[in-house]
Amino acid sequence: MAAKEVIFGDAARAKMVEGVNVLANAVKVTLGPKGRNVVLERSFGAPTVTKDGVSVAKEIELKDKLQNMGAQLVKEVASRTSDNAGDGTTTATVLAQAIVREGMKYVAAGMNPMDLKRGIDKAVAATVEQLAAIAKPCTTTKEIAQVGSISANSDASIGERIAEAMEKVGKEGVITVEDGKSLNDELDIVEGMQFDRGYLSPYFINNPEKQTAILENPFILLCDKKISNIRDLLPVLEQVAKAGRPLLIIAEDIEGEALATLVVNNIRGILKTCAVKAPGFGDRRKAMLEDIAILSGGQVVAEEVGLTLEKITLEELGQAKRIEIGKENTTLIDGNGQAVTIEARVKQIRAQIEEATSDYDREKLQERVAKLAGGVAVIKVGAATEVEMKEKKARVEDALHATRAAVEEGIVPGGGVALLRARAAIKIKGDNPDQEAGIRIVLRAMEEPLRMIVQNAGEEASVVVAKVLEGKGNFGYNAANGTYGDMVEMGVLDPAKVTRSALQNAASIAALLLTTDCMVAEVAEDKAAGGMGDMGGMGGMGGMGGMM
């Protein structure tokens, strides 16, 4: 085991803060409508240009192990916020840095870090309550477009595309983002269905870049039993191979020699296949399989209907124009089902929703209706170059996450105003002076997102913050055009979920940093350049001349 270096107290915290600052300073330049780009080196190909906080954070790895620990903890803030809300990663990083910076002053002054943490937690809980009170539902297409535009770095066309997609497929529908073929963004609405099961083996992947298996014009075999014996599958595999089309198998499970044979056939190119577990459990699984059968115009192989794998023909298999299978999701696009049958199935499920007694059952039934009736919207991102397309695609994905978050928990005024208004309404007290200091740390940190937005726009932060604090309600500063006014009317909106997640995750990690008193890291080994030094003995080789 390698020797470890152990550092205590202020020395440990100072190193960690250095790491926090390096990462946060790199990320926060991207904040706001006038935020700058960050260029990331790639080991091959063109560098990536991004304004996405979490993409920048993930690239940073510091040489100094102690500094790197601090940087990695703040990276966790960005990653967790991205996972929870899909956006707000830069805001979360800015808040974390501010809480750490303010908190370290109090720790250095001798205050109890644990009480500071309790104060921070109290202030965050109170702020979350205030944000929920400020938030208003996001219902109109215009509001959805505004949220999308802000999240896509003030690109109105992206916001409009997302709002249009949501309007077409409903808030429950599936929206995916793809590379476009032209210079402009396009929106395609495709009838389809998505369920949360992915490929059973990574050997089915045929698109390494997206890590997905894509089947064009496939047959679909639906079975409500476990398949482990390849002999059961042989008749249907032979029929599909003769037809020269791919096959997707959706069953309770596929294992053993059946799965191995499918994988081998796929790798050798004899038969393009993919195997997926059926979604849901128990009765819900049977119902979901029936939904897929109706959508694809096939039949479920089940004992109840007298169908077995040996007897099934191509006519009883479902069909679709295209199927995309990822690690966790399968999207079935343009199934071969009859519109009348699908409509009848939707009516049947809606009747079940009326009779459902539990909220959980109702929610699951509504999901099924959305999957049958909603369809899939595909936003095709257009750009002049591949580098621009990658950057734009990342922004579209961010904006999509933000709009979903807005629909879920409502919207608050953007541009850092929501945190300032929530701060003004907080009237809590700590149990002792150290907890009071913890509350003050959070209240001060809540100014930081606005300060950073203003700074990136090239204005004087203190002047703008003071003016915004004088105002009330939605009054704030629009950095895009340098004007003051009602943020909601100007269309500068943030999803409440994004602001809440950013603050909670930032405070959680920052409080851990403040309460750290010891760091343990491997001692860096001096890699001596030696080894070649003994070659001096080779001088005797001169005598080799006599060999001639």
UniProtKB/Swiss-Prot annotation:
Domain of life assignment: Bacteria
Cellular component terms (Gene Ontology): cytoplasm
Keywords, ordered alphabetically: ATP-binding, Chaperone, Cytoplasm, Isomerase, Nucleotide-binding
GO biological process per UniProt: protein refolding
Subcellular locations according to the entry: Cytoplasm
Claim: Cell membrane is one of the keywords in the record: no
GO molecular function, one term: ATP binding
InterPro entries: Chaperonin_Cpn60_CS, Cpn60/GroEL, Cpn60/GroEL/TCP-1, GroEL-like_apical_dom_sf, GROEL-like_equatorial_sf, TCP-1-like_intermed_sf
Catalytic activity entry: ATP + H2O + a folded polypeptide = ADP + phosphate + an unfolded polypeptide
EC number: 5.6.1.7
Binding site for ATP: 30-33, 51, 87-91, 415, 478-480, 494
Subunit organization: Forms a cylinder of 14 subunits composed of two heptameric rings stacked back-to-back. Interacts with the co-chaperonin GroES.
Function: Together with its co-chaperonin GroES, plays an essential role in assisting protein folding. The GroEL-GroES system forms a nano-cage that allows encapsulation of the non-native substrate proteins and provides a physical environment optimized to promote and accelerate protein folding.
Matches recorded under HAMAP family: CH60
Family (UniProt): Belongs to the chaperonin (HSP60) family.
Name used for this protein in its record: Chaperonin GroEL
